[in-house]
Design a protein with these regions (language model features):
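Solvent-exposed soluble domains appended to multi-pass membrane proteins
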Residues: 1-263
Length: 263
């Protein structure tokens, strides 16, 4: 909550000093990163798990989630009332790590049976984009499954999606990523999703090992061009190398908006 208060204060200070300048904040909070075993923590609105006997760490974590939800509601409530366009992207990078006792209890109630799926579930997190003006709406938390163009996505695509919804001019790199997302919606060290929303744990696209993790999705089945997907994946590896390591021959015109767009 204090983190969001600081963010609002910075926003108001910058707006007062530079009225016509847009603002961008990349705000990282460690609110719910752990540990969770402290039994002396006192919450204004504590939450207690009742459908199974939980250790203190799990009760503390869900109480922290409630506290964070309240703070987020207040943050959005503030920006609903400002007199200029505001867009917020909210996401996390992984599920929390618990003590061995808490992890054992969670595994007993897990929806995922295989070790691969349990590992993967630690990196499946919700995200949302909110704006105080009209943008295309899709509520993946309520609609469920992997339905929706941007409900299956990895972090490498989020910046381009945010820029798209912001209505700003996209760089060639952003357009490239949005196109790549159609064929490989999400990717990680554990594998990737294919175009039908099915999780594949192999990193070799032409001979994937399918997982049941995505079996319950409501994607309409479509023919996946595996050769094209493989070509796109290898091309993306080259683009990443140029962006991160190739200082001498970096293709700045690809990664930045065109000069004429900035006039």
């Amino acid at each position: 909550r204090n983190d969001y208060k600081d963010l609002i204060e910075m926003y108001e200070k910058n707006k007062k000093a530079n009225k016509d300048q847009p603002q961008f904040f990349f705000n990282v909070t460690m609110q719910n990163h752990g540990g969770f075993s402290n039994n002396k923590v006192r919450f204004d609105e504590p939450v207690k798990i009742t459908n199974f006997k939980a250790v203190q760490a799990l009760d503390n974590y869900v109480s922290l989630m409630r506290t964070s939800d309240t703070a987020l509601k207040d943050l959005i409530g503030y920006f609903k009332k400002v007199d200029e366009p505001v867009i917020i992207l909210f996401y996390g990078d992984h599920q929390p790590s618990f003590s061995d006792d808490a992890t054992k209890q969670l595994n007993e109630h897990s929806l995922y049976k295989s070790d691969n799926d349990k590992r993967l579930s630690k990196f499946v997190v919700p995200y949302f984009i909110w704006a105080n003006y009209d943008i295309p709406e899709y509520d993946g938390m309520h609609d469920g499954g992997l339905t929706g163009e941007y409900n299956t996505v990895s972090v490498n695509y989020l910046a381009s999606i945010l820029l798209k919804y912001s209505g700003v001019e996209l760089s060639d790199y952003d357009k490239y990523l949005l196109n790549l997302h159609q064929y490989i919606p999400a990717m990680s060290a554990l594998g990737y999703w294919d175009g039908n929303g099915k999780r594949l744990f192999s990193t070799h696209i032409t001979k994937p090992q399918a997982s049941e993790f995505g079996a319950a999705t409501r994607h309409k089945q479509k023919k996946v061009d595996e050769k094209k997907a493989e070509k796109l994946k290898r091309g993306y590896e080259n683009v990443q190398y140029n962006l991160i390591f190739d200082a001498k021959d970096k293709l700045w015109d690809i990664f930045l908006p065109r000069k004429e767009d900035n006039k």
